Regions:
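Short, solvent-exposed loop/turn and secondary-structure capping segments
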Residues: 24-29, 125, 150-151, 197-198
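Alpha-helix termination/capping residues and helix-transition junctions
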Residues: 5-8, 107, 179
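Surface-exposed, flexible loop/turn segments at secondary-structure boundaries
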Residues: 22, 95, 121, 146, ...
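Glycoside hydrolase catalytic-domain groove-lining segments
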Residues: 61, 65-76, 80-155, 170, ...
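Substrate-binding cleft of secreted/luminal carbohydrate-active enzymes
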Residues: 11-13, 18, 143, 157-209, ...
């Protein structure tokens, strides 16, 4: 995958994962490893705990060490086979839930710190903390707004109308780019989801177009207006 894109001028970089489920559940993750089939990581964990005592703190430390090594390995592969593109991080959920130690590990290996943030707008204190710990520029990988007036579920952040949805898009995006370390955002998603739902039943009104490819004019106009002012908004 990496090698075939090495000279692609339209590619910014690669994400190395998405919303890892083990964040703040490292102790339980260790138990799952110990209860599971024999694997190299199980042997390494048992050896680590035997040498350092089986405590919650040591279990967390082991997972952090393993994660550090994983990120180091992945980044070396990226840099070896495609030095022209960025390591865009792991698209964590709310970075406020991530410890400063873990954020610092991310800062060692990512070119960009990425996270998904379904909220009215990214909190400045949250962005300040993430940047202070990682030292990396930041992008939001996912955010959106929806309504219930289209016969679909309202999405992860509900508004009352299509106009409100467009206003919320502008408020979120322009507030995010007002932070000097914020460099990109990805709206989720291009089209509404089918009323019958995707693989997990999710059927949100969150698109820029509906399921018959008809644009939501308010959203399109809002995106144009925001795009035209972003360089003025960005510090």
């Amino acid at each position: 995958m990496v090698a075939k894109n090495v000279d692609n001028p339209w590619l910014i970089g690669y994400f190395v994962g998405n919303e890892p489920a083990w964040i703040n559940d490292e102790v339980r993750l260790c138990q799952i490893i110990l209860d599971g089939p024999d694997r190299p990581i199980k042997a390494a964990l048992k050896k680590y705990l035997e040498s350092n005592a089986d405590t919650d703190e040591n279990r967390v430390a082991f997972i952090y060490d393993a994660f550090d090594k994983f990120l180091e390995t992945v980044d070396k592969v990226y840099k070896k086979y495609d030095p022209h593109h960025l390591n865009l991080g792991m698209r964590f959920a709310n970075p406020d839930t991530i410890t400063e130690t873990l954020l610092s590990i991310c800062g060692k290996h990512f070119d960009v710190f990425s996270f998904n943030a379904y909220m009215l707008a990214p909190d400045k204190d949250m962005l300040d903390r993430a940047y202070a710990c990682t030292g990396k520029p930041m992008i939001v990988g996912e955010y959106h707004f929806g309504t219930v007036d289209r016969g679909l579920a309202q999405a992860l952040w509900q508004t009352d109308s299509e106009k409100d949805r467009a206003d919320c898009y502008r408020y979120y995006t322009e507030n995010a780019y007002a932070h000097p370390a914020f460099i990109g955002s990805g709206y989720f998603q291009w089209s509404d989801q089918d009323i019958t739902g995707r693989f997990d039943g999710e059927n949100y009104n969150c698109g820029l177009v509906d399921v018959t490819d008809r644009p939501y004019k308010a959203m399109v106009d809002a995106m144009i207006a925001t795009a035209e002012c972003l360089y003025d908004v960005h510090c």
